[in-house]
UniProtKB/Swiss-Prot annotation:
This is SAGA complex subunit Spt3. Belongs to the SPT3 family. Component of the 1.8 MDa SAGA (Spt-Ada-Gcn5 acetyltransferase) complex, which is composed of 19 subunits tra1, spt7, taf5, ngg1/ada3, sgf73, spt20, spt8, taf12, taf6, hfi1/ada1, ubp8, gcn5, ada2, spt3, sgf29, taf10, taf9, sgf11 and sus1. It comes from Schizosaccharomyces pombe (strain 972 / ATCC 24843) (Fission yeast). InterPro entries: Histone-fold (IPR009072), TFIID_TAF13 (IPR003195).
Amino acid sequence: MTETGRTSKYRVEIQQMMFILGEVQDPLPETTQLVEELIRGQVMEMLIQANELALRRGSRSITVEDLFFLIRHDRAKVNRLKTYLSWKEVRKKAKEQDANPADTKDLFEEVDSKTRSMNAVAMPWEVKNMFTEPVPETEEFEEDNDTMEMAYATRQRLKMADERTKKMTREEYVHWSECRQASFTYRKGKRFREWCGMSILTDTRPDNDIVDILGFLTFEIVATLTEEALAVKDRMDRIQNSSGSGGSHAAHHPKNCSLFDGLTEGRTPLQVSHVLEAFRRLQIPDKTHTAMRSFHGGLVKSRVYLI
């Protein structure tokens, strides 16, 4: 039970997600609770903004395009979401064809076509969709900058995971694999709706696809917040070590540090201050996506920026 009286609903899932992203196996309870409250606020803000977009369109229902519009400035995240939706559709088709093994060849061909056309989801606000005639696509545009940016971010996470799992025992890797399956929405749709107050913030009940997308974006928020908090902690530790107040460098950074060593081998968990500083940094608006006010003056309403 928290200080505000709200019971944590995703403590275990958040611990598992933070663990695979670089945190120690057992984060501090107050840190986990803070992360849950922050991401809950982010999901609620996402629902509010998506509902406003739907009302502007004259609709009461949130669509997939509304959620895409909210993250349109993060091109790498947009492409990861497109990939997620493409493979989600493939898995759905695979379940439908389980009873007919003769269609396996067609399924593989569909998987290949889905992979090639995962970025073909039409977004009305994109320039290429503003022409009456479709822009012809060639091989030169198959791997654009957005796809390369998405691939780079994915490779960085895979590289970190490879380094952390390289010296694991079988039991440790089994635990790691179980943590990688953590989800906010898989078989937890009802809990997720209650957790973020979906029935209060939306006019109609969003379908399961919207809930799955929100679950994917919620994991992305946890990943971004955890990675930024670890960067803050690393910087603070280096400043402390360089000033001599934190002891020798070797004491805080042992050469042979296992993933499961925890506090006994010098690995310390994230503190609340690290998460708060990371959230503060992530709330600084990107100047490239900020409109000029032309010095008209007046009060500027503060808002929560989506991570």
